């Protein structure tokens, strides 16, 4: 009985925050329209509003991951389209920070949930941009041998309807940022853990990577991170799982 009451209270709280997130989107959208009238004069205000939008999206993502089963839609998606949508979303930050972007594109098709994978790629890009002061970000695809690929027909091979039987491949997002301390690496996927970098940056929430791994595992994907202090960070997402049945 106590567990049931706690579950109901937890659901009520989740519903409340979900309603709050959806309601706050309306004034944010109105502000965005106002700022577009004089974009040059409102550039800094627009940047701050973008940060607010990202925090709101993170909260909404966190709430939805509590029960993703009803919100999952696995389809064969263009990985290139998903990546480019997120690049476009963060284009303003690339420009304002004068960071370079290297991405050649890919013809790969992935069996995934387009919205959720886009959310994860956005989180990784956001982190990379946040902790990169000079240089830039590079995005590429690797095959099962670790070789870079741009257009690989094997990645589009499918078997019977409802089955994805593609070659293993990994999406890599690398930056030239400040890197992650070695002692922090084993804990970066823990909920709320921010590490040394997070303690020096008040904007850190310790939620982005936690959500990213949780979502990717729900999709049958995996994520790993390699990093060197003052050299940068590489995030690898294995996006193909052989004989993954659609449901």
Where does each model-flagged region fall?
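Short conserved segments within the C-terminal catalytic ATPase subdomain
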Residues: 91-103
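Acidic ATP/Mg2+-coordinating residue in the GHKL
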Residues: 175
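Short beta-strand/loop element within the Bergerat-fold HATPase_c
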Residues: 136-154, 162-166
């Amino acid at each position: 009985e106590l567990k049931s009451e706690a579950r109901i209270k937890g659901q009520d709280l989740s519903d409340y925050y979900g309603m709050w997130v959806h309601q706050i989107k309306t004034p944010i959208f109105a502000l965005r329209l106002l700022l577009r009238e004089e974009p040059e004069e409102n550039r800094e205000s627009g940047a701050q509003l973008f940060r607010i939008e990202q925090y709101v999206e993170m909260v909404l993502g966190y709430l939805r991951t509590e029960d993703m089963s009803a919100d999952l839609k696995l389809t064969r998606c263009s990985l290139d389209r998903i990546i480019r949508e997120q690049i476009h979303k963060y284009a303003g930050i690339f420009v304002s920070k004068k960071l370079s972007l290297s991405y050649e594109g890919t013809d790969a098709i992935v069996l995934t949930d387009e919205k959720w994978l886009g959310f994860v790629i956005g989180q990784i890009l956001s982190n990379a941009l946040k902790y990169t002061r000079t240089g830039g970000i590079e995005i590429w695809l690797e095959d099962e041998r670790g070789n870079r690929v741009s257009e690989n027909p094997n990645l589009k091979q499918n078997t019977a309807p409802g089955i994805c039987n593609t070659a293993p491949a990994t999406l890599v997002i690398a930056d030239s940022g400040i890197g992650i301390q070695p002692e922090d690496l084993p804990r970066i996927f823990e909920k709320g853990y921010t590490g040394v970098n997070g303690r020096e940056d008040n904007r850190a929430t310790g939620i982005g990577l936690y959500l990213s791994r949780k979502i990717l595992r729900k999709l049958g994907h995996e994520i790993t991170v390699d990093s060197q202090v003052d050299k940068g960070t590489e995030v690898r997402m294995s996006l193909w799982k052989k004989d993954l049945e659609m449901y």
